[in-house]
Amino acid sequence: MKFFIDTASLDEIKAANELGVLDGVTTNPSLIAKIVKDPANFTYADFKAHIKKICDIVDGPVSAEVTTLKAEEMIAQGEELAAIHENVVIKCPLTVEGLKAIKHFSSNGIKTNATLVFSPTQALLAAKAGADFVSPFVGRLDDISTNGMELVKQIVTIYDNYGYLTEVIVASVRNPLHVVESAMVGADIATIPYSVIKQLANHPLTDKGLEKFMEDAGVMKP
């Protein structure tokens, strides 16, 4: 299973990369907005420069999302983003217009990530249009009392049934259990906030054991 980090923070990306477990990065407009210190003067050129910095840190796919709703505009914007670095993946919303853009990109060798996926039919359409990745949002489904992980299971089954090569990125991950369940149902990737990545390494019994080991190590003579 691959681990992506879901953030636009360069510091978080660097920290996660140092752990040796990072395979890629996903960003979106909301995550970009969190790291902008001067929104009034933040330009599209600044956005592209930031994506380039991320690509310089991580040797893996970096998803950058289009910020328009019409297919023609998504295509123009996506082609501009794809030119930043060979690892850039264009995130398109799973809408009718988004599908048109995904088909265009897949036909022209530009990698895509179908995002904001909340149903198996959306995921099926994404695969048929040639998306390289599909991102079901489990946490947001859980928020409305729907089983988000059940959707992931359905998508994995459908893709396996028909041999689709689209990789499933479990998104909107809220806790370590989401990661465990993603691995158990066979998802290809989980894209995880840095706070949750750190939680994956923690266990109270590990802390307790270390405390005892350090205490016992103190009796050793130099």
From Swiss-Prot:
Active site, renumbered: 91 (schiff-base intermediate with substrate)
Coiled-coil stretches noted in the UniProt entry, renumbered to this chain: none
InterPro entries linked: Aldolase_TIM, TAL/FSA, Transaldolase_3B, Transaldolase_3B/F6P_aldolase, Transaldolase_AS, TSA/FSA_arc/bac
GO cellular component terms, semicolon-separated: cytoplasm
CDD domains recorded: Transaldolase_FSA
Chief location bin: cytoplasm
SUPFAM superfamilies registered for this protein in UniProt: Aldolase
Localization terms from the record: Cytoplasm
Pathway the protein takes part in: Carbohydrate degradation; pentose phosphate pathway; D-glyceraldehyde 3-phosphate and beta-D-fructose 6-phosphate from D-ribose 5-phosphate and D-xylulose 5-phosphate (non-oxidative stage): step 2/3
Molecular function in Gene Ontology: aldehyde-lyase activity; transaldolase activity
Reactions catalysed according to its record: D-sedoheptulose 7-phosphate + D-glyceraldehyde 3-phosphate = D-erythrose 4-phosphate + beta-D-fructose 6-phosphate
EC number of the protein: 2.2.1.2
UniProt record, GO biological process: carbohydrate metabolic process; pentose-phosphate shunt
EC category: transferase
Lineage: superkingdom: Bacteria
Keywords linked to the UniProt accession: Cytoplasm, Pentose shunt, Schiff base, Transferase
Annotated Pfam families: TAL_FSA
Function: Transaldolase is important for the balance of metabolites in the pentose-phosphate pathway.
Family note: Belongs to the transaldolase family. Type 3B subfamily.
Name under which the protein is recorded: Probable transaldolase
Name of encoding gene: tal
